[in-house]
């Protein structure tokens, strides 16, 4: 994660959303 954008999402999606956000 860049900004930990997936706090309520699974860690796999957290990594993806961390890059997007």
Curated annotation (Swiss-Prot):
Classification of source organism: Eukaryota, Fungi, Dikarya, Ascomycota, Saccharomycotina
Q: Where does it primarily localize?
A: secreted
Tagged with keyword Iron:
no
Taxonomic superkingdom: Eukaryota
Q: Which UniProt keywords apply?
A: Cell adhesion, Secreted
- An example of a Gene Ontology BP annotation on this entry? cell adhesion
Q: Does this entry carry the keyword Secreted? A: yes
Q: Which organism is it from?
A: Candida albicans
**What's its job?**
Plays a role in adherence of C.albicans to buccal epithelial cells, and in biofilm formation.
Write down what this protein is called: Complement receptor 3-related protein
- A GO cellular component entry from the record: extracellular region
Q: Where in the cell is it found?
A: Secreted
């Amino acid at each position: 994660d860049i900004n930990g954008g997936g706090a309520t999402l699974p860690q796999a999606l957290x990594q993806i959303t961390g890059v997007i956000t």
